[in-house]
């Protein structure tokens, strides 16, 4: 199986979001749901195929010196944020990404399937806004998949934001219900606070690593995982001497990124 299908695994839910969001109103509600399930089913099958090929295939993804190799499927230039701080858009497979593709697509498939009945009334008729619901589910799936195959930490932040937006849209799906409106607003506000810390942590980390000119290769980016993981011991050691306005940069960035993740996952005390 071609590892370029990683792109298809991520792009198919995006296509389903656009297709169901734009054309769903022209189709029957049940047909929209069935197409959503089929689309997610295809995505899930592709994800399993990719993971099996990565872990058990020959060639790429082999274990070298006890470490299974990371595969950069694609990496396109996007934003130049400063000297040695570039934000690209790309796709990479490593053991964690391959496993998370399976986890995300499997759970999403069963959510799509379960929703066919859950989002119907006692007579089996799909609820109003059924097409919109399945479009939002596809967007949510796309956002999570894009995050786990990211090649750099800034791309993770971008998809991290998209997860927050799609969560807000799903929580507030019943927009005529005061309780749903209140819950969606509360979730949106709390996650925006978390997003601020995450972004600030990314900025501090990018600034700090970019100062290590001997460890960031020419044409490389301080935000890319290939740079951050190329020599983690040396990077961590040298970052200990880097400060951000008088504050040690490494612990500051890691604490901020942790708060971002904690807020997004509603960990205490951001569980309100």
Regions found by a protein language model. Give the residues of each.
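...captures the hydrophobic TM-helix bundle architecture rather than a specific catalytic motif
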Residues: 1-272
